[in-house]
Amino acid sequence: MAASLQAAATLMQPTKVGGVSARNNLQLRSSQSVSKAFGLEPSASRLSCSLQTDLKDFAQKCTDAAKIAGFALATSALVVSGANAEGVPKRLTFDEIQSKTYMEVKGTGTANQCPTIDGGVDSFAFKPGKYNAKKFCLEPTSFTVKAEGVSKNSAPDFQKTKLMTRLTYTLDEIEGPFEVSPDGTVKFEEKDGIDYAAVTVQLPGGERVPFLFTIKQLVASGKPESFSVDFLVPSYRGSSFLDPKGRGGSTGYDNAVALPAGGRGDEEELQKENVKNTASLTGKITFTVTKSNPQTGEVIGVFESIQPSDTDLGAKTPKDVKIQGIWYAQLES
């Protein structure tokens, strides 16, 4: 009996060992197949991961792409700074502007410029007589606002401003009679054209000042070296404009704040807010002729205008705005 059991045990031993070996071989093959599936390769008691290599290559490509993007961004910055460094475009004559196409003018700032004169004399050389001024153009080159300085207790003075409006502030296509007297005096009366433009500038302290650049109802007379006159400055807002509380001059609510019984001292302030005032104010402008060409009928010069800013329909005290620039006109007999 013992002998038979020993023989059975002896016969069972190889089978057990063989089963373990087969199982180990199966596990090894499975591990190898899984490793190949995930890109793992056995090599000299260590595994090298091809996936890790791919990740390194991907990271290197991302780094190279970032370097290229940074270089492109720096190049764009240089291009932009170079464009800004060029400043305003070259001033062209009237014929040069007319010879350009829309796409050649678009985005260059030329449409906001007054033409210049090629040739001529540095004085007003037109003979006495009656002319018709057309293509009258006024291009501001400087906006200053009279206000208190940034420093404490500084006296009010004309402060430099930052323009907040796009290049749409030039007055153009103005026309009217232009007369040259025998004594050398000139007279110009504005009749028609684009004679107003809404402009907003910002003071150094951050306050924004809107105003209506205009020369409405202008009748200027004097010597060509300096002829000036007062002109009309309409309200920046019309009577039908509604404020945030629905109050207007000719429409909207009469008031949006309950009026107190009185005696508080703020009745005047409440009245300014509730009762809208669209009355026009006045400004003064001075023209100076710097060059003329009687053969082409062109004349150019400089101007200085001082006019009030927006009053917010009577709620604010207007500020003085000084506008300096150049002007151009064509005179036809």
Curated annotation (Swiss-Prot):
It is found in: Plastid, Chloroplast thylakoid membrane. Keywords: Chloroplast, Manganese, Membrane, Photosynthesis, Photosystem II, Plastid, Thylakoid, Transit peptide. GO terms for cellular component: chloroplast thylakoid membrane; photosystem II oxygen evolving complex. Residues 1-85 form a transit peptide. Its main location: plastid. SUPFAM superfamilies: OMPA-like (SSF56925). InterPro entries: OMP/PagP_b-brl, PsbO. GO terms for molecular function: oxygen evolving activity. One of its GO terms (biological process) is photosystem II stabilization. Belongs to the PsbO family. Stabilizes the manganese cluster which is the primary site of water splitting. This is Oxygen-evolving enhancer protein 1, chloroplastic. The gene is PSBO.
